[in-house]
Amino acid sequence: MARHAGAAVLLLLPLLLSGCSYFRGGNGEDELEAEPRTGIRYGVEIDGEGVDDQIRSTLLSASDANQTISRPPASELVLRRRAEADLPNIESGLRSLGYYEGTASYDVRTVRDDNQTAQATVGELRDSVEDFLRGAPTILTYHVAPGPRYTMGSVKIVVTDPQDGFLAPTPEALKIEPGQPAAAQPVLDAQGELVSQAQRLGYAFAKADKLDAVIDQDTKLMDVTLSVTTGPIVHMGEFTIVGADHVDPRFLRRRVLFRPADRYHPDVMDKTRQSLIDTNLFSTVAVDQPDKLDATGRLPITYTVTERKPRSIGAGAGYATDEGPIVSFFWEHRNFLGAGEKFESDLYFSPLRQELSTNFIKPDVGARKHNLLASTSVKAEDTDAYESKSVGAGMAIERPLWSDGVTGSLGVAYRLAKIKPKDEEEDSFSLLSLPGTVKMDYSDNLLDPTKGWRLNFLAAPYTDTLNSGASFLKTQATATTYVRLTDSAKYILALRGNLGSIAGSSRDDIPADERFYAGGGGSIRGYGYQLAGPLNDDDDPEGGRSLIELSGELRYRMTDTIGLVYFIDGGTVADSALPSLEERLFIGTGIGLRYITPIGPLRLDVGVPVNRRSGIDDIVQVYVSIGQAY
């Protein structure tokens, strides 16, 4: 059994790091380039009695001087001019929060520390040298006197030229009420919501009139009048899709979510645009909504699209100590028969597994987002547990379930296989199954998620139509969750759990390549492929009828392109039908490097077994691939 780690880490690190901007080529030598930085370094502070975090945050966002820190002024005089010109922005920021009598002034001071000690950190010493060479940093401080905060007085909503019985919403419905702080943003939001509510009722030409806000310095109140002109209720006219020259118009017609004579609704317009984008046939989709009705008194709509090239070809490569080099190729056509059908052919090759597979998706079968799935595969495997050669085919219907992000499928599959467990006789199987799946995805990114969660559930009854006639039920559930530990997503905690069960037949009656195994890059890192489980007398994996895996990763984004990972994986395989922690628990841990690319992170993981078995487990395992581990 080939279970020996090579010098992969030493070979792979230079390859990954060669893409980083920190290493620049020049006659074979690294060059350290320092950008010359001129001008006065400065920072911006806000202080004053009554200044809280909300005021400070708002004023720093409003300050031009704060937004242009990266462009240091040539002199203190230029900085003072910048600060003077910024005072109206500071006072405008105060008014936006309801402080209509607020004032601001500024001063500029240089910060020096003549008490540097031998205990200074490297960063402090560096700053001290910079101070000596370029001058000490400068602080621009705005001294703010907010004054009294005004509150909302009367709130009136006026409908200009009301038509078709439009009833204006109440101020409470617009989240603007007497007595609340007289801040600007809630008033602007209320004005926008007033127009949006009218449009959602069918008034397509609704628009806001002038907003009146009257300040009373004696009562410290602001009286607000919001007004809207609705125009008539509008009904949809004919729709046109321009630019889809190679797509069946009947398919696109099913993607449009309104019909002529339907009442206008802006959300339906946006959802139709997204429905066209979801076909993956167009690079752009633009909506043209005219500002007047056609001759029939309806509103015609035009969607202008730009077609994508329908074909893609690609290749991938990876490496794992326990599997060897991995290469894959794919060819894809996203408009195979002219109505958004997707056909994909994939080739996967490694020393342990070779597979050629095809997948065909026919969208909108019978109803929108109801897809017909068809697949075929030819596969050969030669692992420490078994040798297997098989051909298979399947068909299923996939559709959305109770909400966005949730899909389900139900189908039928057949696989003819010749399987030889190690040190046993070869046997043939004719497996007929009825697989059903439920998939939930509420994560924010397919290859590099930073928040949200996913849940995949599979259940499939199997029966062998050849010799043994064995029947069993195989189920598996995998859940992952992603938690941002900081607002900037610099630290991510990723957790994964995987449970599996096979009921209805003994382990020996279940085909070896349908049993559960643990160990390897997609399972318990640090252990060889399929080795984190029960072994026979020759130390070959036997597999089991149940599986439990738990994983955790702490992901740290050092820069925009470089990330580090610490991970710990654990789990076991058991002969019982229900997962059990009473079996020996296998734990692996390690670190990883991520290089972020537009197609997802390049992943290098180095794992070690915590409870290593002498003569079975290698000291270290290395994995290289694209995408996060989960």
List where the protein language model places each region:
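C-terminal outer-membrane beta-barrel translocator/porin domains of Gram-negative envelope proteins
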Residues: 278, 297, 312, 418-561, ...
